[in-house]
């Protein structure tokens, strides 16, 4: 299972009841943070996410409402006693941005590994996240902006009959199921000797900030959860959305429908949007399985058996 928490669902400026953009994913104790707006640490503390052992931080773009919480978080991580490497992924400019932050943070006893502007699919050189495939897409915003898709792959189902038939020692079963090749007593053992049919993973996609460009539906296709910006609830605000390169509730829902996703989570609401629920029908009339984001909303995604 995968646990996801929307730490902040606001856009532009923080509000008393709405912190800025941030999403936290916990998969088997491995932790991923997507964006880090103001208030992120407060929500993390309230939800007991933990700071020390974040494995990966992904930044969509370098507007303040998505990164102004990162400086403080890097400092807090340092003060937690962390010494292992921390990987940060982001668009063009992320290296210079992190370098500037690093100059302001007094104590960083860990190495920052930065991946700038990755294209297409990639996996991390990280044993604990080896089953995670990440994809990026260039979005249409006022500055360089990345959308992310996280595909949590599953190892194929273990086939005990196959393992027995191939006379594989039981002490090797777990490692082979994890995908390792093993030599024991001069004999080679490979994963295909114990593995059966493939199992479906879980796909989580996120796009913010952007207009609803044609490439998004294919990028988010068949996602179990699609997290999408929805800056404006009222259809009458479409001119603002076009001008500021954001989306309305209805536009986000249309992307979810075109992408054949299972569930849509709306986030990144304008400060002028006092009661987002007033406009929820603008989304549900297009895509029924729509959830309205709120700070510290938690969701659990389960793997199919």
Swiss-Prot record:
Source organism per UniProt: Clostridioides difficile (strain 630)
Role summary: Zinc phosphodiesterase, which displays some tRNA 3'-processing endonuclease activity. Probably involved in tRNA maturation, by removing a 3'-trailer from precursor tRNA.
Cofactor mode of binding and number, as noted: Binds 2 Zn(2+) ions.
InterPro entries listed in its UniProt record: Metallo-B-lactamas (IPR001279), RibonucZ/Hydroxyglut_hydro (IPR036866), RNase_Z/BN (IPR013471)
Subunit structure: Homodimer.
E.C. number: 3.1.26.11
One Pfam family hit: Lactamase_B
Binding site for Zn(2+) 2: 65-66, 209, 268
Gene name linked to the record: rnz
Identification of the protein by name: Ribonuclease Z
Cofactor dependency: Zn(2+)
């Amino acid at each position: 299972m995968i646990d996801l928490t929307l730490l902040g669902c606001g856009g532009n400026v923080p509000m008393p009841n709405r912190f800025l953009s941030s999403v936290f994913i916990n998969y088997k104790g491995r932790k991923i943070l997507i964006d880090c707006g103001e208030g992120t640490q407060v929500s993390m503390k309230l939800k007991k996410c933990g700071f020390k052992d974040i494995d990966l931080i992904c930044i969509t773009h370098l507007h303040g409402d998505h990164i102004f919480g990162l400086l403080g978080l890097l400092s807090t991580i340092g003060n937690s006693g962390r010494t292992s490497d921390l990987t940060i992924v982001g668009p063009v400019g992320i290296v210079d941005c992190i370098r500037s932050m690093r100059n302001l943070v007094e104590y960083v006893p860990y190495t920052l590994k930065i991946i700038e502007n990755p294209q297409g699919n990639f996996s991390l050189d990280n044993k604990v996240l080896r089953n995670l495939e990440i994809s990026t897409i260039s979005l249409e915003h006022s500055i360089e902006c990345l959308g992310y898709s996280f595909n949590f792959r599953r190892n194929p189902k273990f086939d005990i009959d196959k393992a027995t038939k191939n006379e594989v020692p039981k002490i090797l079963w777990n490692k082979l199921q994890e995908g390792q090749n093993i030599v024991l007593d001069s004999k080679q053992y490979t994963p295909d000797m114990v593995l059966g049919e493939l199992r479906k993973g879980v796909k989580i996609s996120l796009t913010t900030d952007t207009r609803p460009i044609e490439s998004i539906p294919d990028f988010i296709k068949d996602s179990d959860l699609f997290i999408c910006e929805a800056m404006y609830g009222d259809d009458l605000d479409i001119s603002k959305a076009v001008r500021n390169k954001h989306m309305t509730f209805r536009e986000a829902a249309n992307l979810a429908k075109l992408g054949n996703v299972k569930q849509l989570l709306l986030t990144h609401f304008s400060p002028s949007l006092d009661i987002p629920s007033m406009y929820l029908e603008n989304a549900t009339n297009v895509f029924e399985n729509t959830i309205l984001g709120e700070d510290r909303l938690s969701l659990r995604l389960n793997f199919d058996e």
